[in-house]
């Protein structure tokens, strides 16, 4: 049942900056192809990089599963415009209604498109971890939206905040439209609110931003230890197909490669911390050690910040 307090949230708040008129709306998102990764399972692989004017804020991997009586959608995207594009791709493949949406975590590039799905299917169940729902109530969605508005120069304008109305917790097993889904959760991973969704029958695992491929994102909202633990949990599954939050779908090499990055960075930071180096002093040494990742999108933008955050984490572990 939908929680009573969540009916209050669904008195949907328009997310616009104070300088943006309510009537304004960003342009439509062009169609991106839905790539078949397994029978009845599709991923719309978004462009890599940060939100921008060029990508209109769309840069994640919306995915959907066509069940026997409906469609299940994972992380529909960053705006109402993205959600409308995702629905267009679904309708090219199925006339069934969207009956459930899963949001992997709090970052709005994955869930602000809920609005378009809710507009088309007002009774749709939207799942997220309880920690995500709490963070929405604390205003994390609003803050992320303001960033999207700035970085896209208003391309996401007109988007409404439609948060999850159902909770999904670690170990939950659901059957929706004939599809079995198993929920995995590791606290303090990429964002403190990250669920991963396993399709055990298809041996598929949706990783959310616990894993990225060929792209480095921010780590300000989580921890290295928790993110590493989440990937190790993912690799304990029987999945053969792994779908990251950003980047191309693949096999075990997808989570294993990102695990290599996080583990190597954290290990190097701890080593140089013991040697008495500051984060600034160790940074060029670690960047050289991680040179195998230097062709990843946003490596230069984020690796220094990652080193500083890992330094603080190592320091905190001493107390």
Regions found by a protein language model. Name each.
Residues 17-19:
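N-terminal signal peptide c-region/cleavage motif recognized by signal peptidases
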Residues 39-92, 195-207:
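Conserved beta-strand hairpin/beta-sheet module of binuclear metal-dependent hydrolase folds
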Residues 40, 65, 75, 90, ...:
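Divalent metal-coordination and catalytic microenvironments
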Residues 88-166, 170-173:
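Active-site HxH/HxHxD metal-binding segment of metal-dependent hydrolases
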């Amino acid at each position: 049942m939908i929680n009573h307090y969540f009916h209050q949230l669904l008195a949907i708040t328009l997310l616009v900056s104070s300088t943006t008129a309510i009537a304004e709306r960003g342009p439509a998102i062009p169609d991106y192809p839905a790539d078949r990764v397994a029978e009845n399972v599709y991923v719309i692989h978004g462009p890599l990089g940060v939100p921008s004017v060029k990508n209109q804020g769309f840069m994640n991997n919306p995915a959907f599963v066509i069940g026997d009586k409906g469609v299940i959608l994972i992380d529909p995207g960053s705006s109402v415009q993205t959600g409308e594009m995702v629905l267009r791709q679904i309708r090219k493949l199925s006339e069934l209604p969207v009956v459930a949406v899963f949001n992997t975590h709090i970052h709005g590039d994955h869930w602000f498109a809920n609005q378009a799905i809710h507009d088309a299917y007002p009774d749709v169940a939207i799942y997220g971890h309880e920690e995500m729902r709490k963070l929405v109530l604390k205003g994390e969605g609003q803050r992320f939206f303001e960033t999207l508005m700035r970085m896209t120069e208003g391309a996401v304008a007109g988007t409404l905040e439609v948060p999850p109305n159902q909770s999904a917790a670690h170990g939950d097993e659901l059957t929706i439209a004939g599809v079995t889904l198993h929920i995995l959760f590791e606290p303090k991973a990429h964002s403190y609110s990250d669920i991963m969704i396993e399709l055990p029958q298809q041996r598929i695992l949706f990783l959310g931003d616990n894993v990225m491929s060929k792209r480095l994102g921010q780590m300000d909202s989580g921890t290295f230890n928790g993110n590493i633990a989440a990937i190790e949990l993912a690799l304990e599954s029987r999945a053969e197909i792994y779908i990251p939050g950003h980047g191309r779908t693949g096999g075990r090499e997808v989570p294993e490669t990102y695990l290599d990055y996080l583990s190597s960075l954290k290990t190097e930071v701890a080593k140089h911390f013991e040697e008495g180096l500051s984060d600034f002093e160790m940074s060029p040494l670690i960047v050289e050690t991680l040179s195998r990742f230097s062709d990843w999108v946003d490596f230069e933008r984020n690796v220094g910040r990652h080193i500083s955050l890992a330094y603080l984490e190592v320091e905190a572990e001493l107390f």
